[in-house]
């Protein structure tokens, strides 16, 4: 065979292979929809040329920056930017993604500090997660929900006894600036240690120093092991502040749908409402009351309706929400506070006047309520909570009259003195949750008026003595705290006796009885000088 023929066969074979590969290759041509930035403002961009984009669709900008299509008009699209946008310019290209905003979920987020996009902020590397959920999800239908029947212990005596919270409830915390709203939420998270409850703390528009303090407290107390922290700082774009609570709720819902109990704290929704107002005004949406857009109620209702208690057929998990709201000059009838009060299942109001008096937590029992938590409250609490709340309400009413200097009868004075000791017992330092057994021992001692003989300046030490003595409570009595059984009279008397012994050293010593005078003890009156007149 000639060398030329061999070479020809080699070429023929090679070309035949190329033809087969070319015929087997089917190029997948997909249309790419590209738009153009027309203008940029604070936290938003106007984009033209994306006719197929959908509402809430994620769009991609240069530099791996994403945004959400918020206004969808024929002429242009208003996009909320989810990150730093200083590098963007008019004329830059914008791509559709065909998907909505989602966030990483799963056990890999426990113990981590992330932003609403799922990016780590704690310097511990990427978040380990293989599953993602959209940040906007429909709330569970009514047929999938179960009544709130299990208590969520906060570790705070005034709340667990008088304003109980149940798993699956939405309880609003509201008050003026610097009255301890965040402290109540953090104490509640700390008390979930050992309770098989996972926690999500969502900081919206907070100072970096305040968030760092919260994270340090959670780490110090060992609570970060079961907590995820979602953070947007005050200098972040408003778009991140807007999506933060929705992303945090999706993280919590993943655990709830797996049959677990979850607590989520929104700190605070005032900043969320302001961020949404800023975005709406920039996007030229019509303003309403206090310049908020007309759907401000809807953005909070659709968020908080996702908190619920699922039926056992759906896993039996629960999501308890503690939204925080800030009031101005104690005005709880303002627009956003009244919206949240009507959406939630109750509220805990913190009074600046109580805070100034040193009553911490500064819970105003008269203005606070729990609409569904009472059904979930432990039976042991119910035996004393009703009488205690009535006595405290009577005290607050009478104390107002006592300030005017009115003369009070003995019964009124007794009610006021008893109420002052109730208020002193309900005081509690920050980051110091109290166990159920210790709380019930203190409450029973209050109902039995064992503290009434204790001086007010000794109430803190006396209350601590009762809590310490509660550790000696019989195990069978402790077991009944977690059951639906009522405390028997013998159990109540045993607990009261433990408290009575603990308070013995704080009671005033009885005054010695004086013997009655006899006739021999009576001395005759001395005669006047000069004797009797004749």
Curated annotation (Swiss-Prot):
Keywords annotated in UniProt: ATP synthesis, ATP-binding, Cell inner membrane, Cell membrane, CF(1), Hydrogen ion transport, Ion transport, Membrane, Nucleotide-binding, Translocase, Transport
Site (Required for activity): 368
PROSITE patterns, A to Z: ATPASE_ALPHA_BETA
Keyword Repressor assigned: no
Binding site for ATP: 175-182
Biased composition (Basic and acidic residues): 514-524
Entry-linked Pfam families: ATP-synt_ab, ATP-synt_ab_C, ATP-synt_ab_N
Assembly description: F-type ATPases have 2 components, CF(1) - the catalytic core - and CF(0) - the membrane proton channel. CF(1) has five subunits: alpha(3), beta(3), gamma(1), delta(1), epsilon(1). CF(0) has three main subunits: a(1), b(2) and c(9-12). The alpha and beta chains form an alternating ring which encloses part of the gamma chain. CF(1) is attached to CF(0) by a central stalk formed by the gamma and epsilon chains, while a peripheral stalk is formed by the delta and b chains.
Family: Belongs to the ATPase alpha/beta chains family.
Name listed for the protein in its UniProt record: ATP synthase subunit alpha 2
Protein's organism: Albidiferax ferrireducens (strain ATCC BAA-621 / DSM 15236 / T118)
Name of encoding gene: atpA2
């Amino acid at each position: 065979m000639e060398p030329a023929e061999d070479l020809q066969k080699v070429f023929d074979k090679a070309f035949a292979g190329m033809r087969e590969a070319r015929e087997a290759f089917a190029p997948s041509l997909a249309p790419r929809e590209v738009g153009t930035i027309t203008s940029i403002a604070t936290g938003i961009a106007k984009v033209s040329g994306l006719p197929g984009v959908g509402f809430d669709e994620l769009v991609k900008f240069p530099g791996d920056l994403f945004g959400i299509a918020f206004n969808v008009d024929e002429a242009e699209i208003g996009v909320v930017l989810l990150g730093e946008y200083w590098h963007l310019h008019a004329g830059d290209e914008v791509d559709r993604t065909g998907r909505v905003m989602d966030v990483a979920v799963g056990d890999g987020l426990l113990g981590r500090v992330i932003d609403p996009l799922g990016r780590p902020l704690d310097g511990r590397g990427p978040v380990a997660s293989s599953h993602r959920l959209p940040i906007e999800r429909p709330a569970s239908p009514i047929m999938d929900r179960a009544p709130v029947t299990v208590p969520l212990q906060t570790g705070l005596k005034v709340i667990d006894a008088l304003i109980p919270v149940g798993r699956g409830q939405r309880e609003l915390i509201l008050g003026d600036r610097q009255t301890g709203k965040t402290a109540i939420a953090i104490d509640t998270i700390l008390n979930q240690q050992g309770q098989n409850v996972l926690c999500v703390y969502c900081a919206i528009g907070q100072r970096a120093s305040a968030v760092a303090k919260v994270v340090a407290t959670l780490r110090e107390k060992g609570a970060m092991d079961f907590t995820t922290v979602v953070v947007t700082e005050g200098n972040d774009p408003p778009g991140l502040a807007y999506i933060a609570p929705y992303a945090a709720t999706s993280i919590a819902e993943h655990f709830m749908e797996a049959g677990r109990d979850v607590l989520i704290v929104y700190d605070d929704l005032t900043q969320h409402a302001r961020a949404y107002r800023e975005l709406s005004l920039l996007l030229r949406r019509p303003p309403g009351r206090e310049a908020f857009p007309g759907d401000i109620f809807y953005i909070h209702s659709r968020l908080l309706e996702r908190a619920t208690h699922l039926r056992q057929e759906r896993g039996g998990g629960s999501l308890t929400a503690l939204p925080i709201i800030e009031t101005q000059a104690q005005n709880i009838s303002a627009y956003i506070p009244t919206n949240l009060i009507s959406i939630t299942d109750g509220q805990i109001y913190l009074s600046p006047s109580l805070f100034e008096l040193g009553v911490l937590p500064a819970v105003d029992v008269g203005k606070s309520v729990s609409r569904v938590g009472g059904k979930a409250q432990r039976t042991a609490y119910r035996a004393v909570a009703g009488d205690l709340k009535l006595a405290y309400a009577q005290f607050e009413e009478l104390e107002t009259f006592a300030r005017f200097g009115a003369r009070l009868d003995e019964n009124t004075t007794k009610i006021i003195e008893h109420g002052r000791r109730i208020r002193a017992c309900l005081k509690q330092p920050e980051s110091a949750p109290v166990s159920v057994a210790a709380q019930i021992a203190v409450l029973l001692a209050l109902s039995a008026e064992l503290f009434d003989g204790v001086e007010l300046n000794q109430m803190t030490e006396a209350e601590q003595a009762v809590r310490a003595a509660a550790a000696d409570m019989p195990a069978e009595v402790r077991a009944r705290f977690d059951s639906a059984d009522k405390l028997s009279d013998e159990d109540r008397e045993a607990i009261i006796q433990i408290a009575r012994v603990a308070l013995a050293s704080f009671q005033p010593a009885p005054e010695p009885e004086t013997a009655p005078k006899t006739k021999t003890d009576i001395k005759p009156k001395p005669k006047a000088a000069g004797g009797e007149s004749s």
